[in-house]
From Swiss-Prot:
Annotated active site: 111 (proton acceptor)
Subunit structure: Homodimer.
Name of the protein in its database record: Ribose-5-phosphate isomerase A
Gene designation: rpiA
Organism this protein belongs to: Cereibacter sphaeroides (strain ATCC 17029 / ATH 2.4.9) (Rhodobacter sphaeroides)
Function: Catalyzes the reversible conversion of ribose-5-phosphate to ribulose 5-phosphate.
Amino acid sequence: MPAELSPIDTAKFAAARRAVDLVQDGMKLGLGTGSTAAWMVRCLAERVREEGLRVQGVPTSTRTAELARALGIQVVTLDEAKWLDLTIDGADEFDADFNLIKGGGAALLQEKIVATASDRMVVIADAAKEVAHLGAFPLPVEVIPFGWQSTKMLIEETLEGMDVLGREVTLRLSGDAPLLTDEKNYILDLHLKRIGEPRQLGLALNQIAGVVENGLFIDICDTVVVGHGDGRVSLRDLQSGQAEEGCIDMDRARNIFADLGD
């Protein structure tokens, strides 16, 4: 166990810890996927253990489900929960309007389904994830394996008419083979550099035969919690205009630190 957290882990913990403060007893929660979301699951488990907090968690990936169960959080399916009070998840990028790119962890389909079945979505991130324009991070698109190369060609053709700076499309690999999502689909990464009209692009991509879902989350995120390497944390809510600043007790992080993976 490291004696001190790195600045990036400090930022992730700070955001996760503040977001978990929003959880109330009896809530049904969407549990995100990724390294920042893993911090959130551990912070939530700490409240369950120490406060007797009663929650049900709907995980957005197999690895999140495994972590939540191992830490004593009650895990249910979305069909069992039906509707969620709150989803907390990370993001690869977010802009001033809280539009997101997600899917770096290849869980974008379940993440979007869970987020849109929630009263509120809270994104947790370090400050580096905030951008003026989406697109520096590759945009993941989940596609059916059957005919994926034809789907790729159709995506490339669609990009010709879009307000983007790059148009390279690559198949995401795991070793020498295509990476498989939890639904056994492939991921195509779109290297766009800058996305001028995220809403237009998201709608166009989902019209292509073979595309299951894309990693643009538009009008889904309500609140962003941003952590910093010194333990400072800010919360911004899009609807209410609420903005607050604070600082997290980093001794709490050291007490629950473990190998989170991603």
